Design a protein with these regions (language model features):
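Residue-identity detector for glycine
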Residues: 2-5, 9-11, 15
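N-terminal pre-domain/capping segments
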Residues: 12-156, 171-175, 179-182, 189
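Active-site groove signature of glycoside hydrolases
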Residues: 150-170, 191-204
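Distinct, well-ordered alpha-helical segments
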Residues: 171-178, 201-214
Length: 214
């Protein structure tokens, strides 16, 4: 009697089909900048949008940390979350109120070269399926700008949430995921990026808590 599945070294044989063997890849150790939002005070980073990145790279170097996970977010003036609902409004260390062009990229790449600290990925943690269609569109447009920035900086991955529409049942959310989120994944792939899903059901995605980290 033949075996249903076996490995010949190059893959797993299932019947007449060969499934490629899993090849684990090491994860780069990095420090999420959102963990310390006020390393560069907001007033300073609002005035100089790239200062926070430079200071985070230097801080990581002092900690002997090889990389940072750079946090991006809509600026408090553009976000759908009331300021009073958050301790520090938003960890937008990557500030994209103005276009992230090649001049800005050169400045950050120079800081990376000077410190020897890399960017593991860019993180934009937001509810990409939020119920309000205008807010959802604004978040999707911002995510596309994050993708473009990652590509310009030579970063190969973006990390973020999927989210949930708290006004819909789960089956409806799955439909919304296919309609709204899959196109974002295709945009990431078109730029040569991997989208890393942060598996984290935030409290703000339930009907009893509309705002906390939503």
């Amino acid at each position: 009697m033949g075996r249903k599945g076996y490995s010949d070294g190059s893959g797993i044989q299932v019947g007449t089909m060969t499934v490629r063997a899993f090849e684990p890849k090491p994860m780069r150790l990095s420090l999420l900048t959102a963990a310390l939002q006020e390393l560069t005070p907001r007033a300073q980073r609002d005035a100089d949008p790239d200062l926070a990145i430079e200071e985070w790279l230097q801080f990581a170097r002092e900690l002997d940390c090889p990389a940072i996970q750079l946090s991006a977010a809509l600026h408090p003036s553009q976000a759908d979350v009331p300021a009073e609902a958050l301790l520090d409004p938003v960890a937008n260390h990557l500030d994209l109120r103005a276009p992230f062009d090649r001049n800005r990229a050169r400045r950050i790449l120079a800081a990376i070269g000077a410190t020897g600290v890399a960017l593991s990925d860019i993180a934009y943690f937001d509810n990409m399926l939020v119920a309000d269609p205008d807010a959802r569109q604004r978040k999707h447009e911002f995510m596309l700008r994050v993708f473009d920035t990652a590509a310009l900086l030579g970063v190969d991955a973006v990390c973020g949430f999927v989210g949930r529409n708290a006004e819909l049942e789960m089956d409806q959310n799955l439909d919304l995921f296919e309609e709204e989120f899959i196109p974002l994944l295709k945009e990431a792939k078109a730029r040569g990026l991997t989208y890393r899903v942060e598996q984290c059901p935030m409290p703000g995605w339930v009907v009893t808590d509309r705002w906390h980290n939503n």
